Curated annotation (Swiss-Prot):
Motif Effector region: where in chain: 35-43
Source organism per UniProt: Oryza sativa subsp. japonica (Rice)
Keywords (A to Z) from UniProt: Cytoplasm, GTP-binding, Lipoprotein, Membrane, Methylation, Nucleotide-binding, Prenylation
GO cellular component: cell projection; cytoplasmic vesicle; cytoskeleton; plasma membrane
Protein name, as recorded: Rac-like GTP-binding protein 6
Classification via InterPro entries: P-loop_NTPase (IPR027417), Small_GTP-bd (IPR005225), Small_GTPase (IPR001806), Small_GTPase_Rho (IPR003578)
Lipid-acceptor residues (S-geranylgeranyl cysteine): 194
SMART domains: RAB, RAS, RHO
Gene coding for it: RAC6
Entry keyword annotation includes Oxidoreductase: no
Length: 197
């Protein structure tokens, strides 16, 4: 077996969309029931991918505006971002392109982004929408459209509570780092070359 490769994976997105729960669900197979806003936290997990051991460094960030100046400090050296929004929060969905993409392009240009829709278990929960009349569910088609708009290689919906697709989120993050998608070659206009010295 080869030496382990370190991959730094940073979660970003609005506060309370479920970033920390997704990390805890992935690393410990449990679901925390209390909401405690994250300041910054790190997790580490050894994962075997195609016979290679990967040390996946998971960096959790705070989405609240109070941390706008501090949060980008965790972006340095990132190999991949998990950009999360809640499937039951239109505001968090809209902030992907309004807030998070501009921030990531400014502080970490060129780093791949996996778009993640969280709280999948609540999207089809009729009682949730009765109890929260202002909540608007985000469809899979809307998520795919946003993925195309921001140029993310993957869009994955998951539920940390039921663990549905949680592993898939992190598998995609590892895959995009180990096997980056081929960049489309830009066609250069064929013209006669002329140099003036």
């Amino acid at each position: 077996m080869s030496a382990s490769r370190f991959i730094k994976c940073v979660t970003v997105g609005d506060g309370a969309v479920g970033k920390t729960c997704m990390l805890i669900s992935y690393t410990s197979n449990t679901f925390p029931t209390d909401y405690v806003p994250t300041v910054f936290d790190n997790f580490s997990a050894n994962v075997v991918v195609d016979g290679n051991t990967v040390n996946l460094g998971l960096w959790d960030t705070a989405g609240q505006e109070d941390y706008n100046r501090l949060r980008p400090l965790s972006y340095r050296g990132a190999d991949v971002f998990l950009l999360a929004f809640s499937l039951i929060s239109k505001a968090s969905y809209e902030n992907v392109s309004k807030k998070w993409i501009p921030e990531l392009k400014h502080y970490a240009p060129g780093v791949p982004i996996i778009l993640v829709g969280t709280k999948l278990d609540l999207r089809d929960d009729k009682q949730f929408f009765v109890d929260h009349p202002g909540a608007v569910p985000i469809t899979t088609a809307q998520g795919e459209e946003l993925r195309k708009q921001i140029g993310a290689p993957y869009y994955i919906e998951c539920s940390s509570k039921t663990q549905l697709n949680v592993k898939g989120v992190f598998d995609a993050a590892i895959k995009v780092v180990l096997q980056p998608p081929k960049a489309k070659k830009k066609k250069k206009a064929q013209r006669g070359a002329c140099s003036i010295l």
